[in-house]
Every structure is written in C-alpha cells, then in structure tokens.
Amino acid sequence: MTVDLREEKELAQQRFKEICKHAKIVDTHNDFPYLLRVQLRNKLQLAEFDFENGLTSHTDLVKMRQGQVGVQFFSCFIECKNPNYLYQDFDTPTTVVRDTLEQIDVTRRLVCKYNNDLKFVDCADDAIAAFRNNGKIAIALGVEGLHQVDTSLAVLRQYYSLGVRYITLTHNCDNPFATAASSITGGLPDRGLSAYGIECIFEMNRLGMMVDLSHVSHRTMHDALDVTKAPVIFSHSSAYTLTEHERNVRDDVLERLKTNGGVVQVNFYQDFIRKPGSDRATIDDAADHILHIIKVAGWEHVGLGSDFDGIPQGPKGLEDVSKYPDLICKIIERTNATNEQIEGLMGLNVLRVWKKTELVALQLSKKLEPIESSWSGRKWEFYSYAKEFPELFPDAYKLNEKSTVWNYDQPLNIEK
C-alpha cells in the first residue's frame, strides 16, 4: 500500500470515528433468530449460548459493538411450506403462524435476557434515538414473506400489535398476494401483485407497516410502487445492473425510488453482489452496489441489509457484523460524500422511511377502517351443528354460502 493510500485510509477511519459519535449502523435484515430455531430449538438458557461474550455465528453482542450497530432488524423468518418453492395450494393448513409467533417470542426473549445491552423498539423515534446515542442497541422485528400470515390480514394486524414493523411481500414462493422472484427464475409467469395484494398493501399503509419488496418479482415491484401510499424498502437486495439476479433491483425500479422515497438496503450474499466469473464476492463488490444505487437513485435511497446469519459466508472483508465500519470507510475513501450522506447510508435513510410510514398511517387511520377482505380462494369450514345456533339477523347464514363448507355432520352435543 502506498503512503497516499495509507493516509487516505487513515483519514477515512478518523472521519468514520467522528461520525460514530452521533450516528450508528442500521441493518434491516439479519437472520440470527433462525439460527436459534434450527440449532437450539429457541432455548436461550443453554450454557454454551454465550451471546454476550462471543459466538461462531456472524452475529453476537461483541461483534455488534465492534460493528457500531445502533439498530438491528431481526428477521422472524419461517420457510415456505413447499420444499420446491412452489406455493399453489394456499388454503392447506400449515403451522407457519405458530412458528412465526415462536420467532417473535424468541427474539423478544433475547432482548429481555440481554437488557443491559439491547432494547426493543417499535417506533421510528425510538430507533432514531438509538441511532444517535451510544447506548443500548435497538432491536426491531421484520417478517420475511406474506406466506407467514397464512392468507389472513387479521394475522398481519396481530403481527403489527406484537411489534413487527416490516413484512416482505414474498419469500421464495408465490402467495395469494404477490409473485416471487424465485418463480421467475423457475420459469413461471410474472403475475405481479394480485387484487388481494393491493388490499394488503393498503392495510400495511393504514397500520404503519413498512412494505418490503425484497424477494418479489420485477412486475410486483412496479405494481407495489403504483399503489402504495408510503415509501417502500428493499430490506436485503442489491443492484441488478451489476449482478443479474432476479433478487436484485433493476434500474427502472431504482429510478422510481426518487419519487416514492424508498430505500434499497444492500445485501451481502455472494450470488447477489459478486462480479460475473468471480468465485467469491469482496467488500469492494458490496461498495460497488452501494455506489451504483447512489448513481441511479441518489444518496437518500440506499442503506445496509446484510442478510448475515442467513447466508453461508459474507464477502471477503465483510465476514461478519463487526466489519460494517470497513465498508463505510471504503465508501468514504471512494466518494466525496458529506457526513450527512454517510449518515443516510449508515441508517438514517431507512429510519426516515419508517417515520414517513408512520405519518402516512396516522393520516389513513383517521379515514379508513381495518380491511376485512379475505382471500377469494379460502374455504370456511364449520360443523353443521353451527346452523342450529341463533342467526344474528334474518338469512345471516346465507351471506357467505359460496365460501362455506358444512362438511362436518357431527350432532350438537351440549351436556346439561
């Protein structure tokens, strides 16, 4: 390394250190709770689980402090039910809601267990305070796919009441709301957003739930941008122009973020950021994706969504959560960015989206009632004896005959 390059690097580090006196890192996607599920069955009291002093995962408290993390969104992720990532029989009962609740529970218990260092946040102002202060790390919740609401907007509302503040419209499967990027990769048609999906976005806007467009198809991105009243996020996606993968964001969508106000949080997964022909992605590849998004959309529309602990390994130079400072310093070295622009990249951009989403909800909630629609393909099954109970009003039982299945001929048995 030449003297000039060494000095440039040292200056970037000094500047980052100064910025960190009043700004921290916000990461919108980390799958650490999934490791707790698949490896520990969500048991946090095991002696071997030493989150406070260091683990071999991408994430632990030591690495988070080293990485200058101020706000971390943990993903309450549960897989699509079909191992082939196809999701056509949407009305088959699953355990996905139970499993999602367990992930919300274990994340909140983690915060309680380490409450000297972590705190739970469910509003933008509290997250902004954590971003600005050198205190406890703020933990927020996201859900990675509307398959996890099991076709029900009522479940969506209950997730919000439990503190979930963004939901990804799809994971690696279609659902009644939207088309997934994985379906396009698999050769299936891009149907975009369904009519029910539009209603879902309106309900998310009404609640103050951020709309996450990572994992969705190209058409779904445009459809969502056409109807949402609030800015969107891409919680963990990168730039399609640099790495042509359906999980990434094309330039025509990046252009629309200037009007929508949304952000792309750059993902560190190898397949989404490495150069064609390269065996492994590097920290410079991640920086390239950040800079491309800035070039097309602007400094206000980019952030960090690593996908740590949901990917096998990080890029070279970005091996775990502790390495965020190296990436920010790389951007400082390669640009003439102002401190305000660097703060936006570090996390203020996505916190602005969160705050704007809350303000939109404040206005909509004054005018709109909760959306009571259900998926058109849903069958409501009841025991036949239910028809023996009093009607709420004449012919109430006939209102929903087309979607009702009376296929349980079990007699009413009331013990006196």
Curated annotation (Swiss-Prot):
Q: Which reaction does it catalyse?
A: an L-aminoacyl-L-amino acid + H2O = 2 an L-alpha-amino acid
Q: Name one GO cellular component term.
A: cytosol
One GO molecular-function entry: metal ion binding
Q: Which cofactor does it need?
A: Zn(2+)
User: Among its keywords, does the record have Hydrolase?
Assistant: yes
Which top EC class is given? hydrolase
- Give any Pfam family that matches: Peptidase_M19
CDD domains this protein is in?
rDP_like (cd01301)
Q: Does the keyword Metal-binding apply?
A: yes
UniProt xrefs under InterPro entries: Metal_Hydrolase (IPR032466), Pept_M19 (IPR008257)
What name appears for this protein in its UniProt entry? Uncharacterized dipeptidase C965.12
